[in-house]
Amino acid sequence: GPNIHQILTTISSKAVCNIGEIIDLNIKNNNQPIKIFWCQLSIDKALIISWYNTNELISLLNNYLKPQTNLINMTFGYTALSLIGPLNTQLLSKLTDINLNANLFTSKNCRTVKLAEIYTILLNFNLKSLSNYILLVETSYGEYLWNTLISLGNEFNIKPLGYSGYN
């Protein structure tokens, strides 16, 4: 909502996040820092990513909200896919007209795009030295996008990697 900047500055007085950027923040909970990633999608929408317990995080974030600001848990409404590797930009370029040049869409950037005609939240979020895109799509489109990526990815020798592969 319109008070999204107020939430960000309440969480961290020094935090500034422009549209399309992803920043790391620590929220204190009983003097324990909770790491979140704040992804500013538009002037009035942000995506918060964390590996912390969802219900506890929502409860904690609600402490920062004014009555007219809404926090919506979209965890179960989206499928997350990750494309890791040196050819991922080439593969994604087959599915969108958006320029994904690394100089224009750097790591720790986000935007909404159409991939294979599907509204997608695209995060460029490198893992150490590995190029990594995280794709968030409505759950009902997850399997379709997965199959499209695997099919088009054959020329790039794409391989499925389970969650354990992140470690």
Question: How should these model regions be labeled?
Answer:
Residues G1-N167:
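Basic, glycine/lysine-rich polyanion-binding surfaces/domains
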